[in-house]
Swiss-Prot record:
One of the primary rRNA binding proteins, it binds directly to 16S rRNA central domain where it helps coordinate assembly of the platform of the 30S subunit. It comes from the Bacteria. This is Small ribosomal subunit protein uS8. Belongs to the universal ribosomal protein uS8 family. Pfam families: Ribosomal_S8 (PF00410). InterPro entries: Ribosomal_uS8, Ribosomal_uS8_CS, Ribosomal_uS8_sf. It comes from Symbiobacterium thermophilum (strain DSM 24528 / JCM 14929 / IAM 14863 / T). One of its GO terms (molecular function) is rRNA binding. One of its GO terms (cellular component) is ribonucleoprotein complex.
Length: 132
């Protein structure tokens, strides 16, 4: 299946699995998706992930995280920069998500990182998505 926006597809699959209380979700793999999922793990939004080599593209298996009584850890995911409308932020214009409760994921010249890391390093870049 050809997907015009792979990052939006990743976020939609995670959102749908989260709303259905699934334990895991499989998404087609890429370096960019792996970097985004690694940030989600480091920030505590998912439990874990693994790369499954299937001979060509690879698959990322994401293990979702829930709190006590099956409360969702991920409240929302939003794609910001889209193929039809790219959104860039200078280093002093990096957005804060819910006053610092969520994260913005940026693609910078030094790789994919959170809004906090980009501010610390003084970098701007493409705002990929918000997670809260």
């Amino acid at each position: 299946m050809v997907v015009s926006d792979p990052i939006a597809d990743l976020l939609t699959r995670i959102r749908n699995a989260n709303l259905a209380y699934h334990d895991r979700v499989d998404v087609p793999g890429s370096k960019m998706k792996k970097a985004i999922v690694q940030i989600m793990k480091d920030e505590g939004f998912i439990r874990d992930f693994e790369w499954i080599d299937n001979g060509h593209q690879g698959v990322i298996r994401i293990y979702l995280k829930y709190g006590p009584n099956k409360t969702r850890v991920i409240s929302g995911l939003r794609r910001i920069s889209k193929p039809g409308l790219r959104v860039y932020a200078k280093r002093d214009q990096i957005p804060r998500v819910l006053g610092g409760l969520g994260i913005a994921i940026l693609s910078t010249s030094k790789g994919v990182m959170t809004d906090k890391q980009a501010r610390q390093q003084g970098l701007g870049g493409e705002v990929l998505c918000y997670i809260w």
